[in-house]
Amino acid sequence: MKSLLKILPLFTLLFFSCQKEYETLGPKEELLQQIAQLNQEIEAFEQMAQKNASNKQLQQSFEKSRLTYKKIEWAVEYFTPEPARFINGPALDELEVEENKFLNPSGFQVIEELIYPTFSTKEKAALQREIAVLKGLIMQVKEHVSAITISPDYVVDAVKMQMYRIITLGITGFDSPISNNSIPEAQASLLALPSVIEKLHQEPSQIQNSLLDRIRKAAAFCNSAKDFNSFDRALFIKNYLNPISKNLQEFQQHYKIANVAKTNAILQTASSLFGSKVFNVDAFIPSQEYAYTSAKAQLGKELFYDTSFSKEGTRSCASCHNPELAFTDGLKTNLSLNGSQLLRNTPTLTYAGLQNAQFWDMRQTDLEKQSLDVIQNKDEMHGNIRDNINNISSNPSYQKLIQKAFPKSKKLEEWQLQNALASYVRSLNKFNSKFDQHFTEPATELSEEEQLGFNVFAGKGKCATCHFIPLFNGTVPPAYKKTEQEVIGTPQIKNGKKIDPDLGRYAQYKMPQLLHAFKTPTLRNAALTAPYMHNGAFESLEEVVVFYNEGGGAGTGITVDNQTLPSDKLNLTDKEQKALVAFMKTLTDSK
């Protein structure tokens, strides 16, 4: 706790220091009032904890505080992201692997674990301690908001991000994993937005009225939820949330509100979270000179099939990444150059450019480093990019491609070959699956079974709390600045009772939380990428669903002391499991 409280005052206002000054707006005053209200409710919750209130009273007070927080989440997450991750982040240690240290979790989700399903008086001291930390975090938010100027462009951008947050986290149970109060909380978030938007302009318009009407109708639809599991998320997103995002874009254009000048994973021009023109691959590059161009990708495509990168000239990138199998190889694990089994399953390269870590063990941060790692690996290619530069530069079939890709360069350099290969991989994001078309093209509809599968995925199955919509990987929305790993207890063999011995991220960082931890991969094109898991233990999607339904490794009887996947059974019916598989098959890109 001390380490957490020490770092909080270090958060600065640098992000806003160079911005144009605007007259202070109404949203700021309202926001400060709501922060004060939240603080009062947390203090009331604290008093209940001190007075040995009943379990029901504690939970009701907690839920009241959560609903108030959700009203200001749009601003807290946007303007104070560092405190926000401790206010409402997962109840897991916050790892800082480069420094080999971690921060204990805090905030609402830690408190939720203490009081749900029932509160034990043995946890009274822990509860009071966590409430004190939460109050300190709220104070940090108040001080920060008091010091900044909130201008219309930031408000609109923050509201956009909140809409994406509701879709990807808010309605999936990500931050309400035990109480399952996600739908009322999403409703609270929505109901807070009209007041914020109305304060941006003194001149209402039909566009503004339409936007506010859609938001209120979306909030009203939340009342249709009988419970967390039965809520129709597919309908909610398509008919309510996506149109709000589109209206927000129209509202911004009508009032000539500028875009915020920043490099974001979601393009400023995106009118929803779904489609082929939403994500910015340049948000995941090492620096601006690595920016994507189609010319680089074309050069990279030729290099991808070039066997000269391997020492013996027998293997190219395509040898293990077959386009017909979504750039995998269909093997449990591939073979090394000497014919022995490699340690891990070959992952898909589709959508690999939209994550902040590469390889199962996340040992490289970007695709440029990934390509170099593979080429130099003695078991995989055993090549040397430097030695190959002259051969490629002098090859007539490459010369025009090189000139188009890097027109300002006098000679080809190593980083450019890496960048070209990476650019080709960054071009493999089609976003044209049946799932994508369902949310972008009125004429395309998921079947009843597929929609049930999506609702299970984003609801009862809790799949979307790790495989985030719409990338379905572990890159955390809506900022997409962090890619997560999980410990799920994958067995050494199917139906086995021993965990696979692969150390995962622990091999690079000797932190107990990372033992057997692996990156959360994308599920896009999963129907083409069998077998599954880092070791290829499962042969079908059906087997994977059964494994998760049982609670992962710990749920099946494997000893996994640090499993991050809840070990409780999901209790999915046969119909739900079948529907879940049917849904995952809709994530296959069209050719």
PLM segments and residue spans:
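Sec-exported extracytoplasmic/periplasmic mature domains
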Residues: E43, Q47-Q50, E63-E77, Y116, ...
